[in-house]
Amino acid sequence: MDQMRGHLELGYPNEACGALIGRVDAVDHEVIEFRGMRNIITDRPWDRYALDPLEQLRVQKDAESRGLEIIGFAHSHPDHPPVPSRFDADHAWSFYSYVVASVQNGVLREARSWRLDDAKAFQEEPLRVDEGAASS
């Protein structure tokens, strides 16, 4: 997803973030588009992120108006592996997919998707991306 790659690389050396918009079926999440959002963390933006709640609400309403929903979130880990941190786990909800992208020296090198299980531990998951819709 070029939109996600560009936004997460642009945020380097800080964490950048955004919403994954798409559909959920009985088995997995399908990403239709990525919406870059502002990281409102100011004291440690290089290793923390938080979304602006009002911006998140606007993105959610826009998605719902098109029959879609926020199915997860993506954020970068500057110069670190694409594995959720303890901070990530402490601030995550179980329904959503969380894409963590390793951005090394400003270049996205690897991204992996995770979801919390019932024990509040992240489990890696496959994530379907509708490349046709995502590139529009």
PLM features: what roles do these ranges have?
Residues M1-I70, D79-S136:
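Conserved beta-strand-loop surface patch within small alpha/beta domains used
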Residues F73:
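Conserved, mostly hydrophobic/aromatic
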Residues S76:
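Residue-level "edge-of-site" marker
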